[in-house]
């Protein structure tokens, strides 16, 4: 299906799963209840966060329907609850009151440059919430 350019097992493990979970070094994940993953692609980082922290309510948003269909299959196969997918553009859903300022945490990885990504993501974060952009291999607080 070609959802990611990384195909080697060790590389997938490190660059997708470990990288997705690295934010727990920077935030208190136990205080997070709701997460939206903008431009989720194959489900990273939102899917690993949901698997390891099942108490989270996660929304995975992507503009490509083939990715959303894939994610729906994964969610069903894994029997995950409290996880939703959205097919569409981040800037469009951000205008909807159902999603605007509703999330404790907004994450995004490899979507756009930081200024554009901030415009996409910040509308989703509630007051006091957190926006994390996965932009390098190092965690900076």
Predicted regions and their residues:
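Active-site phosphate/pyrophosphate- and oxyanion-stabilizing loops and adjacent acidic/basic residues
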Residues: 21, 47, 119
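Conserved SAM-binding loop of SAM-dependent methyltransferases across substrates and taxa
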Residues: 42-55
């Amino acid at each position: 299906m070609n959802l990611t350019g990384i195909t080697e097992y060790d590389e997938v493990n490190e660059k997708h799963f470990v990288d997705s979970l690295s934010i727990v070094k920077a935030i208190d994940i136990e205080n997070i209840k709701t997460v939206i993953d903008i431009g989720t692609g194959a489900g990273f980082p939102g899917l690993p966060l949901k698997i390891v922290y099942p108490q989270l309510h996660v929304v995975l948003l992507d503009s490509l329907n083939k990715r959303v269909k894939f994610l729906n299959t994964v969610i069903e196969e894994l029997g995950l609850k409290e996880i939703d997918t959205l097919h569409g553009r981040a800037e469009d859903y951000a205008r909807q009151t159902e999603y605007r300022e509703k999330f404790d945490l907004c994450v995004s990885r490899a979507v756009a440059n930081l200024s554009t990504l901030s415009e996409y993501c910040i509308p989703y974060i509630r007051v006091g919430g957190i926006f994390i952009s996965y932009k390098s291999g190092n965690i900076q607080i």
